[in-house]
Amino acid sequence: MLEQSESHAFINNAPKEDRIQVKFEQLFESLPLPLRAEEALSKLRHDSARLMILKTSDPTLNMSTYSIEDSPMGFECLKYNLSDNNKLLSQNNYRLPDYLEEDEIVSYTFSKTGPTTSKNKHPSHSNTIRSPPYKVKKESCHTEINNVSNVSTESINVIDASRGYSPYTSVDSLSVSKNRSFISLEESASNQYDAAEAFYFNADSSSPLRKLSPIELPVTPIRRKTPTINPNSELKRLQTFGKLILHKGSRRR
């Protein structure tokens, strides 16, 4: 468990000399990227980098942000300000610690005071979800996720397997917004409102993962059946709106 008081903040100026090549997943190919991918990737060190997408209208950040993750050991995260005609205005490199392992859920946030991180081992998948540590009061629950076409039921497949992603079969809570355009999946360590990891997407789009967006306030979630994470673990709190990142991939060592 990594408490917020123990969160690590890391300084700028991580090495970025080596150019790398990355084959983008369909998810990222379908997204409009104001920042040229090769320009961003040229600033990373390792050959196992993966693209993380974050676009936010958070007034505290006052920018649109796209992040690139670079990690066989630890993380190299680049933050770009794209608010001026989609040009690269500023860049901050943050070095996160090397203790992160595979199959961990990691909460990561960019802030004015620097990045912080918390982690929790998750037994069911190797995907990593990034989201800011806002507070959330949400009852933990569990559901099986099966079908992406019917957002009005309890069976929702948030990940299209044909795109190379494994379905999340043990997400702790599921809710659909009132207009059923957005779906929220949150993972929680217990019933104590003490942890949540969420990603949002537009379920009305022809490609569910094409647009990552903030969600409306959710409807009542489904009741928990069985816990899927160690109840002794904790993740940072987050709110059901804000900037969120969906990030896929097993780390290559």
Swiss-Prot record:
Region listing for Disordered, in residue ranges: 113-136
Compartments it resides in: Cytoplasm; Cytoplasm, Cytoskeleton, Microtubule organizing center, Spindle pole body; Chromosome, Centromere
Superkingdom: Eukaryota
Principal cellular location given in the protein's record: cytoplasm
A GO CC annotation given for this chain: CENP-A recruiting complex
Keyword Cell cycle: yes
Keyword terms of this UniProt record: Cell cycle, Cell division, Centromere, Chromosome, Cytoplasm, Cytoskeleton, Mitosis
Entry annotated with the keyword 4Fe-4S: no
A biological process term (GO) from this entry: mitotic sister chromatid segregation
Function as written in the Swiss-Prot or TrEMBL entry: Component of the CENP-A recruiting complex that ensures the integrity of mitotic spindles through maintenance of kinetochore factors mis6/CENP-I and cnp1/CENP-A. Seems dispensable for proper chromosome segregation.
Assembly behavior: Component of the CENP-A recruiting complex composed of at least mis16, mis19, mis19 and mis20.
Protein name per Swiss-Prot or TrEMBL: CENP-A recruiting complex protein mis20
